C-alpha cells in the first residue's frame, strides 16, 4: 500500500477538504449519521470521511449548484441561498474522492420524492466547458450550465481576459463545432469573435 510506505518514511498525505452548504445527512459505514443541515454558512467534509460514507440523504433539496471557482462559491453562500438549495464547491478538475462525493450527493438527491434541478457555474473558458462536460457525462446527466452563457459574458465583459493564443482560439473553434459542447455554441462564437474569456 502506497500510503503505508509513505507513512513509514514519515510522509503523511493530508485529506482533501470538500466544501458545501445545504441540508444533507451523511451515513457512515458504521451507521453513525452526520447532519450538516444547520451549517448554513458553509460545511466541510474530509476525504477520509467520504471514503467511509455509505450514503447521503438530501432533505427537501430542489436545486443543486456546483460552483467551479472558490471566490464565486464564497460570495454565493454569503448571499444566504434558499433552504431548498444545495451549493457545492466543485473546485476544478475533481479527484476520484471528490467524484465519489459528488456521486453520493447526486444519488441522495435522486432518492427524494421530488426531482431536483442540477446546475454548474464554471468559468466561461475552455476549462470551464470541459469541467461541465465531465461532470455531466460521468455523474449528473441532467446538468445544465449556470451563468456560462453569452448574456453573462456580455454582463461581465469588463472582467474578461483577452485571448492571445491562436491555439486557444483553435480549441474554441473545435468546441464550437463539437456536439458535446452544443449548449455553449453561442457564447463560444462570441468568445472567438471578440477574443475574450471570463
Regions found by a protein language model. Name each.
Residues 113-125:
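Acidic beta-strand-to-loop metal/phosphate-binding motif
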Residues 1-89, 94-108, 127, 133-137, ...:
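Nucleic-acid enzyme cleavage-core boundary/entry regions
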